[in-house]
């Protein structure tokens, strides 16, 4: 069982050591190469290098990659609070087929006693005037850590870009049941937030994967470009296995939607997350 770091609040040394272990081992940010200067030792670097596994079959950047890179929640770091996500949205202006790197430009919207809000522009790092996506979100503080926590040392993962890289859903141990249903195994430390709940990273990846899969079945093609995503985290996903069930919806003008519900099977099939994704049909191609 993954431990909730809030159990260590009365022991600053143990809390700091556990946060270092958990943050340093969290797969979401390390796998896509996202550095958070508010948490990590080292220089500020808000760019992400785009690999083959971060693109769909048309070459567009995946909605889940934008979500992991800009998780929002009000710029509240784990050094000052125990944050939890509430709502996240992403609107894509440019799929970034020829973009090699993108930069996340986040701004604090408002921070209250418990609730916090932020938004970001995601731009082409080599041509900053080119906006790829807009994200925004809301987070909540569910605990207060000991004072004086130091920044974390995080060893980056060296992922060599290749067309043969496994899809992100496979990296996070996802499994397909059918066209509309996917699963993740029981909660493990590398996919858990410090408060012992399924991190937003695998949730972004698997809700998009289930949505795309369901629409591919409906539309008869996987050549789908992400348009938008909206995710509501309605309860902490604490146990697992987790089931992702998507409902595809056909629209007009080659636009398709999917509504996905996430259930914690280890907690009496509790509904923990709901997400909506929009895609448009496009000609299949390769990223240049």
Predicted features along the sequence, with ranges:
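HotDog/MaoC-like acyl-thioester-processing domains
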Residues: 2-10, 68, 72, 82-83, ...
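A short interface-forming secondary-structure element
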Residues: 48-61, 186-198, 203
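Hydrophobic, helix-prone linear segments
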Residues: 1-88, 98-99, 119, 129, ...
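Short structured motifs
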Residues: 30-36, 86-93, 170-173, 227-232, ...
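Hydrophobic residues in beta-strands and at strand termini
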Residues: 48-50, 92-93, 187, 233, ...
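Glycine/small-residue-rich hydrophobic helix-like segments
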Residues: 209-247
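Non-catalytic linker/capping segments at the edges of enzyme domains
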Residues: 1-47, 137-191
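Active-site helix/loop of acyl-thioester processing domains in fatty-acid/polyketide metabolism
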Residues: 61-84, 199-224
């Amino acid at each position: 069982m993954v431990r909730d770091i809030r159990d260590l609040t009365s022991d600053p040394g143990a809390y700091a050591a556990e946060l270092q272990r958990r943050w340093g081992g969290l797969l979401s940010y390390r796998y896509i190469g996202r550095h958070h200067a508010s948490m990590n030792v080292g220089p500020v670097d808000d760019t992400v290098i785009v690999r083959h596994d971060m693109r769909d079959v048309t070459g567009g950047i995946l909605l889940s990659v934008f979500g992991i890179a800009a998780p929002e929640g009000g710029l509240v770091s784990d050094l000052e609070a125990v944050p939890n996500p509430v709502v996240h949205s992403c609107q894509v202006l440019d799929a970034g087929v020829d973009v090699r790197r993108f930069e996340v430009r986040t701004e604090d919207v408002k921070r209250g006693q418990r609730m916090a809000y932020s938004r970001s522009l995601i731009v082409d790092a080599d041509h900053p005037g080119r906006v790829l996506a807009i994200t925004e979100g809301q987070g909540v503080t569910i605990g207060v850590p000991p004072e004086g926590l130091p920044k974390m040392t995080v060893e980056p993962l060296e992922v060599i870009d290749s067309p043969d890289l496994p899809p992100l859903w496979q990296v996070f141990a996802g499994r397909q049941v059918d066209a509309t249903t996917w699963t993740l195994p029981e909660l493990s430390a590398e996919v858990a937030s410090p408060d012992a709940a399924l991190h937003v990273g695998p949730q972004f990846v698997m809700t998009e994967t289930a949505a795309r899969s369901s629409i591919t079945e409906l539309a008869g093609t996987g050549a789908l470009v992400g348009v938008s995503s909206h995710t509501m985290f309605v309860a902490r996903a604490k146990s697992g296995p987790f089931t992702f069930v998507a409902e595809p919806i056909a629209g007009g003008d080659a636009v398709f939607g999917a509504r996905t519900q996430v259930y914690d099977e280890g907690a009496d099939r509790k509904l923990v997350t709901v997400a909506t994704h929009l895609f448009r049909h496009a000609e299949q191609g390769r990223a240049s």
